[in-house]
């Protein structure tokens, strides 16, 4: 964040059965995580990304609840396959993304890619330089996520 990156919240527990029981459960986790982040770096994030995405989890009440506490939800509209097992190698992840860019040309106006860098996702880290090159070669630019970002869907 000190170099200009955004800080967002994903959840505290990542427990779907817990966080999606109600809008209050979800926002409670956001606020719990927000406080933890604030205690460490003195920044209060207002951006979240729902574990597993909002589709199938969020109802209008969830959208209202996050809006009521001043958050925006930033979802993804493309993925490398590192979460579903289709991107087992760096080259496969790059190819998964390349294929999506071809079949979804509307992504050229607003692309948010689901990628993970935690343990077990070493292929994603290895794929990142090639993904950046692929996107730059196709004219994409990179920006920091802010509250002004339009929805990715």
State where each predicted segment sits:
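Catalytic domains of cell-wall/extracellular-matrix polysaccharide-remodeling enzymes
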Residues: 2, 8, 13-114, 118-136, ...
């Amino acid at each position: 964040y000190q170099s200009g990156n955004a800080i967002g919240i994903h959840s505290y527990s990542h427990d779907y059965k817990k966080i999606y029981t109600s809008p209050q459960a979800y926002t409670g986790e956001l606020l719990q995580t927000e406080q933890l982040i604030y205690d460490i770096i003195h920044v209060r994030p207002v951006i979240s990304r729902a574990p597993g995405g909002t589709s199938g989890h969020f109802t209008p009440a969830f959208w209202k609840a996050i809006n009521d506490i001043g958050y925006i939800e930033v979802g993804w509209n493309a993925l490398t396959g590192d979460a579903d097992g289709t991107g087992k190698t760096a080259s496969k992840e790059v190819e998964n993304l390349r294929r999506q860019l071809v079949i979804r040309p509307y992504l050229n106006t607003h692309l948010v890619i689901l990628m993970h860098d935690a343990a077990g996702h070493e292929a994603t880290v290895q794929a990142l330089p090639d993904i950046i090159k692929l996107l730059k070669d196709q004219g994409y630019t990179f920006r920091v996520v802010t509250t002004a970002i339009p929805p990715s869907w």
